Curated annotation (Swiss-Prot):
Cell compartment(s), UniProt: Cell membrane
Membrane topology, record value: Multi-pass membrane protein
Organism: Streptomyces coelicolor (strain ATCC BAA-471 / A3(2) / M145)
Biological role: Involved in cell division. Coordinates growth and cell division. May act as an inhibitor of Z-ring formation.
Transmembrane segments: 31-51, 61-81
Record flagged with keyword Kinase: no
Induction, per UniProt: Expression peaks immediately before the appearance of aerial hyphae.
GO terms for cellular component: plasma membrane
Name by which UniProt lists this protein: Cell division protein CrgA
Disordered: annotated span: 1-20
One Gene Ontology term from the biological process aspect of the record: cell division
């Protein structure tokens, strides 16, 4: 029975080195102030509603004032997704 040939192994060549590329993380200047303002406005809206027993900020909304306050807070979280 004939012997099979041994295949010559290819010489090891290391992969080319990757150069680190700097990523520009340019955050928009307006994002952080708007985000914090939305959080504070939402929190203040809810606190004022509870402290005044529902007569402020908008009396005709009634308990929907809580939804408005949480809406401001949710908008703050929405704006926070733009922060880099």
């Amino acid at each position: 029975m004939p012997k099979s040939r041994i295949r010559k192994k290819a010489d090891y060549t290391p992969p080319p080195s990757k150069q680190a590329t700097s990523i520009k993380l340019t955050s928009r200047g307006w994002v952080a102030p708007v985000m914090l303002a939305m959080f504070v406005i939402g929190l203040a809206w809810i606190v004022v509603f509870y402290v005044t027993d529902g007569s402020l900020p908008i009396d005709s909304l009634g308990n929907w004032n809580i939804v408005v306050g949480f809406g401001f807070i949710a908008a703050g979280f929405g704006v926070s997704t733009q922060w880099k």
